Amino acid sequence: MKHSGFQAKRLIQLALPVLIAQVTQTMMGFIDTVMAGRVSAVDMAAVAVGTSLWLPAILFVQGLLMAFTPLFAHHNGANNQKAIQPLAFQGAYLALIGGLGVMVFLASAPLVLSHMNLEPQLYNLTIGYIDGILWGAPAFVLYQVLRGCSEGISYTLPTMVIGFVGLAVNIPANYIFIYGHFGIPAMGGAGCGIATALVFWAMLIAMAIYMQFHKKFAALAPFSQFHRPDFATMKKMTKLGLPIAMALFFEVSLFAIIALLLAPLGATVVASHQIALNFSAIVFMLPLSIGIAVSIRIGYYLGRDRADISAVVAKVGLLLALSLALSTAILTVLFRFQIAELYNSDPEVVVLAGSLMLMAALYQLSDSVQVVAAGALRGYKDTRSAFYITLFSYWGIGMSLGYTLAYTDFIVPAMGAHGFWTGLIAGLTSAALLFFIRLRYIQKHRVHLSLIEGDSVHH
């Protein structure tokens, strides 16, 4: 078992900096909300509405670029670091195209928002926020490419360091643009958008400097030569990345739409649902970090032609995530009301959120299996299955069952928010099972899904 122990240690070493980086990212969102909220509730709402538009768009591009990391890891495992740089350039071109797409989409935000009958003040502040943040889109997506290179060579520390850089820029930038200092007018929630764009540029520049001068990147020499766009590679990578982008989009859109569908049931229900969901999202960072580490390690060992060790990595990753999920689920059940009180002191909200937390605890178990299994499949370059599995599980099962239970008496009397959570648990459990079955299939049949060197190669 020494082997499993070693793999578990390596996974934790890789996952920990990724986890801390995610915590800093979540902290930034939290700080934005609080600092805008100190101006007024409308400013806080503007940041929330603006985020619900730009986040799905930028995550879509991030999903597209997630396909690169296991490939970088594959080249690293094969001792072929010089193949990473030309591939990263193609990633950067794709990122720029995607980033421009996001900017165009955000520039057309008034068209979308005009259909949402917002109060004039909220509408104007939201547009202001979006007009600021859209200038950060190219920096955000280019940073993802550099981050992928670093994580691809099994070096996740910069991700964490740059996370702290972002946090360090975020607070003073918010202070200046939200409240107005150093001759800059107070812009309220709208200033948050400019501050966030500055954070993205600071993170990109810091990462580029880190990679240029740190000895870890000497063999990679990321900026030593220039590569022209190679459309064949870009097309192949888009084919590999698009299913991940779509899978991410299905997930994000599902949660956004559930929140909208719960709105008619009143503020208490929506608030309770948001509390359970937000807490789940925080807990989700644990298995997500392990999933990212698993995809890096599997790519690395496949590059070394050690499919046997890749299988060990997947198994250890799943066991690690499940044992963590069991611990967090038990803590969630024990402290569910205390957790709800951290968010809101309204007794009605606390009681409802507390009961949803019981469901969130169950949800954590399925969630951890599905995210690690999906990470493992990315390592095997099998991304297409993610598209079908998430579409079927989240929308086919999760959404349809959730809606039926929440709003109709078709199966049981209408359950409201609990109905959607039952649907979510069913959908995630389905995804976890299907991802696991697919993973076993690929390992058993040793299908080395190598899209870059031509199509499927059987070992």
From Swiss-Prot:
GO cellular component, one term: plasma membrane
Topology with respect to the bilayer: Multi-pass membrane protein
Keywords from the named record: Antiport, Cell inner membrane, Cell membrane, Ion transport, Membrane, Transmembrane, Transmembrane helix, Transport
Subcellular location: Cell inner membrane
Main localization of the protein described in the UniProt heading: membrane
Transmembrane segments: 12-31, 46-68, 89-111, 121-143, 155-177, 187-209, 244-266, 281-303, 316-335, 350-372, 385-407, 417-439
GO BP terms, alphabetized: monoatomic ion transport; response to antibiotic
Gene Ontology molecular functions: antiporter activity; xenobiotic transmembrane transporter activity
Role this protein plays: Multidrug efflux pump.
NCBIfam families reported in the protein's UniProt record: matE (TIGR00797)
Family to which this protein belongs: Belongs to the multi antimicrobial extrusion (MATE) (TC 2.A.66.1) family.
Protein name, entry field: Probable multidrug resistance protein NorM
UniProt organism field: Shewanella oneidensis (strain ATCC 700550 / JCM 31522 / CIP 106686 / LMG 19005 / NCIMB 14063 / MR-1)
